[in-house]
């Protein structure tokens, strides 16, 4: 009888199908896509814009919050390190 999974069709395209698809796609693709693009010689000036007020407040809050989280994490790690520093690390050889 066999397994039902083995009788189902493979959901992904085979290599032959993908090769046929690429051949047909090349006919419809313009030649411009294959040519390297040359940057234009127009002078582009980048302007540095100051972020508006609310964005500065949000940035400062996020910076403060990330520093607080990092500080708490380091304190927690230090506490656990002191608590368990005298227990030797034992490597296991099996699961």
UniProtKB/Swiss-Prot annotation:
Chain residues carrying a lipid of type S-palmitoyl cysteine: 3
Post-translational modification: May be palmitoylated at Cys-3.
Keyword terms of this UniProt record: Cell membrane, Lipoprotein, Membrane, Myristate, Palmitate, Phosphoprotein
Compartments reported by the entry: Cell membrane
GO cellular component labels: plasma membrane
Keyword Ribosomal protein attached: no
Residues lipid-modified (N-myristoyl glycine): 2
Signal sequence, renumbered to the chain: none
Major place of residence: membrane
Region (PKA-RI-binding): 56-74
GO molecular function: protein kinase A regulatory subunit binding
Residues bearing PTM Phosphoserine: 40, 92
Keyword Lipoprotein listed: yes
PANTHER family: SMALL MEMBRANE A-KINASE ANCHOR PROTEIN
Similarity section: Belongs to the small membrane AKAP family.
Function: Binds to type I regulatory subunits of protein kinase A (PKA-RI) and may anchor/target them to the plasma membrane.
Subunit structure and binding partners: Interacts with PKA type I regulatory subunits PRKAR1A and PRKAR1B. Also binds to type II regulatory subunits, but at a tenfold lower affinity.
Protein name listed in UniProt: Small membrane A-kinase anchor protein
Organism this protein belongs to: Bos taurus
